[in-house]
C-alpha cells in the first residue's frame, strides 16, 4: 500500500511510545508504574528493590498504547552501582533490547524534596519531554508542610 504521490506507508501499527519512570529510591516509582500498567512489581521500603527495568503497557486510546519502563531508583545519573548503571543506560538508549525512552516521568518525594531535586537538572538536561510528578504531598501535609508547585515549576523551567 502506498500514499498517493508518496512513499509506501508502513505496514502495521506505529511503534509504541516509551515512557521511563525515574526517581530516587522509595519515591513511589513502582507504585505509580503498577497503577498505570495494572502489573504488580515488588514495592518495598528499601533501596535496590528494582535493580533491573520492568516494562508494562498503558493503553491510552482504543488502539494506542505506551510502553512504561519502571527503572531502579537513583540519586544521580553518574552510575556508581548496578541499579544506577541500568537507569543510566536505559535513559541514554544504551541498554541492549530496550528502546530509548521518548518521555520521562520524574517522580520526586516532596517529603525529601531538597535531596531529590538534585536529580532534576541531569534528567532535564537529557532534552527529553519530562513530567515532574510531586509525590507524597499528603504525607508532607500531615507533617504540617506544603510545596509551592507553581514556584517549583518556574524554577525548573
Language-model-derived ranges and their functions:
Residues 1-82, 94, 98-103:
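Conserved G1/Walker A P-loop phosphate-binding module
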Amino acid at each position: 500500500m502506498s500514499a498517493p504521490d508518496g512513499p509506501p506507508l508502513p505496514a502495521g501499527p506505529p511503534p509504541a511510545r516509551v515512557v521511563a519512570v525515574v526517581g530516587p529510591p522509595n519515591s513511589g516509582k513502582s507504585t505509580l508504574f503498577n497503577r498505570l500498567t495494572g502489573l504488580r512489581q515488588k514495592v518495598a521500603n528499601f533501596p535496590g528493590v528494582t535493580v533491573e527495568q520492568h516494562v508494562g503497557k498503558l493503553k491510552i486510546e482504543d488502539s494506542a498504547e505506551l510502553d512504561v519502563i519502571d527503572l531502579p531508583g537513583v540519586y544521580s545519573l553518574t552510575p556508581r552501582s548496578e541499579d544506577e548503571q541500568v537507569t543510566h543506560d536505559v535513559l541514554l538508549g544504551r541498554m541492549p533490547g530496550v528502546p530509548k525512552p521518548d518521555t520521562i516521568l520524574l517522580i520526586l518525594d516532596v517529603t525529601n524534596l531538597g535531596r531529590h531535586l538534585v536529580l532534576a537538572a541531569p534528567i532535564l538536561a537529557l532534552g527529553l519531554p519530562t513530567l515532574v510528578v510531586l509525590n507524597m504531598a499528603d504525607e508532607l501535609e500531615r507533617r504540617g508542610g506544603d510545596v509551592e508547585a507553581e514556584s517549583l515549576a518556574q524554577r525548573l523551567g
